[in-house]
Amino acid sequence: MSKSASRARLADIIRTRSFGRGEITLASGRKSDFYFNLKPTMLDPEGAALLAELTYEALRDEQVDYIGGLEMGAVPLAGAIAQLSWLKNHPIAAFFVRKKPKEHGARLAVEGLAKGESLAGKRCVIVEDVTTTGGSAIKAVEAVRESGAEIVLVLTMVDREEGATEAFAAAGLPFRSLYKASEFLNR
């Protein structure tokens, strides 16, 4: 399937499985009359495969060592990308960033690294399922930077177009999205 056909098919899956209208309160606290819940798409076999493929293609030229997903929404995505990268003989390891460190055990904010493994000096991409203001991803970036990593890109599946682009620019972070909310609202 061509990239444009994959993108169109994934948009159809998102529209069917993950997009809805109706009043909802977002993680940012804002009210909205539409929402995206990408978990049903990320956990659908075809949706997961297409998300992984398009995301992998979007970051392939970034010379990435690791891809980190925000808890909980982007964890399935990070895993799918890691698996696909292995199949393409260009392995990119995955980790996830907790909203807050666990209060027991190792008390880590960044999870998924093997004992003795470190992000220090590594090039990382942070992935998010849906981005509104960018606040959650910026907090995740801070946690990953504390591990010594270089953040080369923040990549979201859907940008709600409510200030994230400006927030990432102000933070000096490159930001891209696979889709814009307007692509779903205007259909």
From Swiss-Prot:
GO terms for biological process: 'de novo' UMP biosynthetic process; pyrimidine nucleobase biosynthetic process. Its EC number is 2.4.2.10. It catalyses: orotidine 5'-phosphate + diphosphate = orotate + 5-phospho-alpha-D-ribose 1-diphosphate. This is Orotate phosphoribosyltransferase. It comes from Rhodopseudomonas palustris (strain HaA2). Belongs to the purine/pyrimidine phosphoribosyltransferase family. PyrE subfamily. It comes from the Bacteria. CDD domains: PRTases_typeI. 5-phospho-alpha-D-ribose 1-diphosphate binds at residues 98-99, 102, 104, 128-136. Orotate binds at residues 132, 160. Pathway: Pyrimidine metabolism; UMP biosynthesis via de novo pathway; UMP from orotate: step 1/2. Its cofactor is Mg(2+). Catalyzes the transfer of a ribosyl phosphate group from 5-phosphoribose 1-diphosphate to orotate, leading to the formation of orotidine monophosphate (OMP). The gene is pyrE. Homodimer. GO terms for molecular function: magnesium ion binding; orotate phosphoribosyltransferase activity. Keywords: Glycosyltransferase, Magnesium, Pyrimidine biosynthesis, Transferase.
